[in-house]
Amino acid sequence: MTRKTRRLWIVIACLACVGSAAALTLRAFSSNIVFFMAPSQVKANPPSPDRTIRLGGMVMAGSLHRINENGTPVNAFEVTDGQAAVEVHYTGILPDLFREGQSVVALGTVQKDGGFTASEVLAKHDETYMPKEVADELKRTGKWDPRFGKAPDASSWDTMTAKKAGG
Amino acid sequence: MFGPEQGHFALALACVLALVQFAVPLWGASRRDARLVGLAPYLAVSQLIALGYSFLCLVMCAVSDDFSVQNVAANSAVSKPLLYKITGVWGNHEGSVLLWTLILAVCGGAVSLFGRNLPDILRGRVLAILGGVSAGFQMFCLLTSDPFDRVFPAPMDGQGMNPLLQDPGLAFHPPILYTGYVGFAVPFAFAVAALIEGRVDAAWGRWVRPWAVAAWCFLTCGIALGSWWSYYVLGWGGYWFWDPVENASLIPWLTGTALVHSAIVVEKREGLKIWTVLLAIATFSFSLSGTFLVRSGILNSVHAFANDPARGVFILALLAIVIGGSLTLFAWRAPSLTSTGLFSPVSREGSLVLNNILLCSICAVVVTGTMYPPFMQLLAGRTISVGKPFFDAATIPLTLPLLLAMGVGTALPWKRAQLARTFSHLYAAAGIAAIGLVLCFWKLSGILPIACGALAVWVIAASVSDVLRRIGIGHTSVQGVWERMKNLPRSSWGAALAHIGAGITILGLCGMSQAEHAIVEVHIGETRSLAGDDWTLLDVHDYIGPNYKAMQADIAIRHNGKLVTILHPEKRDFTTQSQTTTEVAIHTNFITDLYGVIGDRHGTGQDTTYVLRLHRNPLAPWMWLGGLVMAIGGAFSLSDRRMRIGAPKRASARNMARA
C-alpha cells in the first residue's frame, strides 16, 4: 500500500463520516429546532400543532388552577407577556421554583383551540432573576427599559397586566 | 498567617513566578543554555507552593467565617456545615478560577517531579507553556475576579449557599471535572513544545499518552458524577439534558478520547503525528472555551457580561491568545512533521483512524448543536433552542459504526490485517452479540435502542474474547495461560476494561430509553400500578429539619403482592432562602431503579390528595458504573510500566547491562 492510496482511503473515510454527520445534523435541525415564542406571537400567528415551541412569559397572578382528568392531575395557568395571554395545560409536578406572578418557560405544542399543552415547565430562577428570553420580550414590548433601572417587581407588573387584560 | 492579604500576595507572587517560568526556559532553550532551562522545574514547584498557599488562605477565610471578604460574605454563612464551607470555596466564579489555576500549577509540579527522564529542553519548554497559560489565568483572577476582595462594612452573616448545591456529589464534582479539563493542558504543552522543536517521534508519543490518559480518566469520572448528580438531586428522572454546560464537558471528552487513541499510533508506528498534535491543541482549546465561555454565560447569552464587560473581554483575549497562538504555530510548523509508518486501511492503525474520524464527527455535531442557537440569536435575532431530540437523531447513528469498529479494532494486528483471519477470532463474540440482539428485540422497543444494545453486547464480548485469545485460553496449558496473563501488558488489560465500560454505559443508556413513568394524584392508602409494580402511598408526615421544614411520604412498592421496598421521598422548604427542594427516593437492585418523587399536597381533611411522580428506570446505574469502569481501565493502563515516563530508558539500560 503506497502513501497515496492510503491517503485516498483516509480522505474517503473522512468525507463519508463528515458527510453523514452533516446530513444527520441538517435533518435533525429541520425537524427538531425549537423556537421561542411569546404569548402575543402565538396569538398573532399560531404555529401548527405538530410543532414544538418554547413559550415564555409571566404566570398571570391568580390564574393557576387544577383540573383532574381521569385521576391524572393537570395544572392549568395563563402565561402572559403583557399583550396577550395563553392558557397552558401541564400534566405533572410543577417545578419547585414555579410561582404565580413570576416568569416561566414552557415546552410544548399549541393546540387547535389556541391552548398550549406543555410537556415540560421550567422555572429555573429566584426572586430577582428572569429568563433571558422573558427579559428580552419585556424590553421588546416596552414594559421595561433596562436604561431606567431594574426590572419591575414581577408580581405588581403582572397584576397590572391582568387588569389590563381583563379590562 | 492565613489572612486574605497574605493570600492575595501569594497569588500575585505565583503570577510573577509563572511569568518567569514562561519566559526564562523558552529563552534558555533557544540559546541552548542548560542552566536557564534547568530553572523551569524549580519555578514550577515554587509557583505551585505560592498558589497552594493562596488557595489555603481562601479556604481559611471561609472556614473562619471572615465575612469582611466579599466572596465569603456572598457565598457562605455561619450556619453552613464545615464540609460545605470548604467545598463552597469553589462553588462560585472567583473561587473556581483560583481552583482552576491551582490544578494547572499542580500539573506543572507533576511534570517537574515525574518528568525527570524527559530531555531537559523539552521539559523546559513544556513547563514554559504551562507557566504561560497559568500566568494568563492568574492575571485574570487578580485583575477581574479577585477572590480576596474586602467588603466594608463587613456583614454579620453571609448570604448562604443555594440549598440545591449543598450536596456531597456536587461538592467534589468540580475539582474532578476541572482536573480533567486542566489535565489536557499537559498534552497541549507537549504539542506546542514539539511544534517549537519541530520534531515528533515515538518517544514523544510515549511521553504524552500517560498525561492524556490521566486527564481523560478524570474527565470521564467528572462527567459521570455530574450526570449522576442531576439524576438524584434534580428529581426530573433524567440524567443528561444536553444543555450547553453539559455539552462543554462532552466536547473535550470526545476529542480527548480521540487523542488517547491517536497517540497510540504515534507511539507504536510513528504515524498520525500532525493529527495528534492538532488533537492535543483542539482538546485543550475546547476545555478552555468550555469552562470559561459557557460557565460565564457568553454562550448562553452574549450580553451576560454586560455588568462586568472587563471580564468578558479579558477572557476572550486570553482564549484568542492561547488558541489562536497555538493554531498559528501549528499552521507554521506542522508541515515539517512527517509520518513514516505505512499501513493498510485494514489494520490496527486503520481502525484507530476510523475511531478518530467518527469521534470527531460526533464532536462536530455536538459543537454545531451547541453553538447554533447563540449564533442564530446573534445574527438573526431569533431565539431558538435545540434539545435531546436533535442530539439523539444526529449523534446516535454515528455512534453505531463506532461501536462496531470498537469490537473489530482491538482484534486487528498492526500494519496489515487479513480480514478472514481476524473474523475467525471474532466468531464467538459475534455469536454472543447475536444472542444479545435477540434479547434486545425481546426487551427493548425502537430500532436505535435495539441496535445500540446489540452493539454494546458486541463490544463487551469482543473485548473479553480478545483478552481470552491473547492469554491463550484453550490453546495452552493452565501454566501457560498464567504466564501469558502475567506477560500481557497492563495497557491491554486497561484498554479492554475501558471498552467494556463503554459497552456497559451504552447498555445503561439503552435501558434508560425504555424508562416508564406516571404522574398520579392519590389519597393516602390508594394504590397505583406502574409496569407491573404496585405503588401504595402509606402515609405522609411533616417534620422539622435543621434549617428546613419537610414533608415526607412513605410509599410501599409491591411486586406480585411481595413487598419490594418502602420509599421515603421528601419535599423540603428552606424558609430563609425561600426555596423548596425535592429529595428523590431511589431503590436500586443494580438492574432497575425505582424512583419516587412527592409533589404538592391538595385539599384538606379526608379529601387531602398528593401528587406523586413514579419512575421505573431499567439499567440506570449501569450508565455511571460504565463510566467508572472506563476510568478504572484508564488508570490500569497508566500503571503499565511502558506508560511510565522513562521506563523504556531504564529497561534498555538493564538490557545493556545484561548484555
From Swiss-Prot, chain A:
Residues 1-7 are cytoplasmic. Residues 29-167 are periplasmic. It comes from the Bacteria. One of its GO terms (cellular component) is plasma membrane. Residues 141-150 have a biased composition (Basic and acidic residues). It is a single-pass type II membrane protein. Disulfide bonds: none annotated. Belongs to the CcmE/CycJ family. HAMAP family: CcmE (MF_01959). This is Cytochrome c-type biogenesis protein CcmE. It comes from Gluconobacter oxydans (strain 621H) (Gluconobacter suboxydans). The gene is ccmE.
